[in-house]
Amino acid sequence: MPKSSEQNNESVVKSILERSSYRNVESCKRDILAALHHYRGLQPRQQKYVFNDGRSRDLICLEGTIPVPYKGQSYNIPVSIFVLDTHPTHAPICYVRPTSEMRKYYFLPYVFIFNVFKPKN
């Protein structure tokens, strides 16, 4: 990654951490910058996260793509990774953000078994 991009990421992360209520700022900054250096398709931004109980917080979100090797190929998978304000005590919350072009295949064992053993009329 070019130096200017790394410096920009560092200033964005530092700015978000200064405006937020992260408990362990240095650990967060170090781990986030390491992730951004390793996965160059990610970008830091501040984003509101709504928890299951309805509470919301402004968190650092790493958005973009990460390369995932599968059967000899590398696929860039779009993700959103929310770094909690309690990091490193609690793990980040990660989401895969499929694009409209991604093929979706769902395997539901109950439906499969039902169709295989369905009585024939």
Language model features with spans:
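Compact alpha/beta protein-protein interaction domains typified by the UBC
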Residues: 56-117
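Strand-helix-loop interaction patch of compact alpha/beta domains
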Residues: 2, 6-75
